[in-house]
Amino acid sequence: MLGVLFFNERRHYMTNEQIKASLAPCGLSCEKCFAHVDGDIRRYSLKLKEKLGNFDIYAKRYETLLGDPVFKKYPDFKEMLDYFASENCKGCRNEQCKMFKNCGVRGCHQEKQIDYCYECDEFPCNRTNFDENLYKAWVRINEIIKNEGIEKYYERTLNRPRYI
């Protein structure tokens, strides 16, 4: 079904193909990942960098003027913000996952020619190379997608943070 389903969080209509493009074959949301080039975290980080301008200079002054040592930590904050704002990943369907270098899902899904892991006869398997926590989440997510359908899963998780 390629019809219009509903608005996403950016108020754009989403089709099944667009939903598939936003989710990795494992079921995790690439768009919500901090490393995604078109993700909210990168977009908000770029905006915050723009709004902060040359705050480096002021952070040093505020440390003295306000007597608050928290401003000593601004360089660390800025380093993290710069990292979040950098172009990093185009999503697991477009390139090898940059978050999990040993991820076995992309190669497997291409080999098996499936959209999501739950569609595989061998699901769940040990080809993912995920740690225990991610493996459990992967199984749970794919079981939900299998039982509820991708549209319902996407809609249900649309406004939920990626990192919960």
Listing of model-derived features with the role each one plays in the protein:
Residues 1-13:
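Short, Lys/Arg-enriched N-terminal segments with co-localized hydrophobic residues
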Residues 13-164:
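Cysteine-centered metal-binding/redox modules
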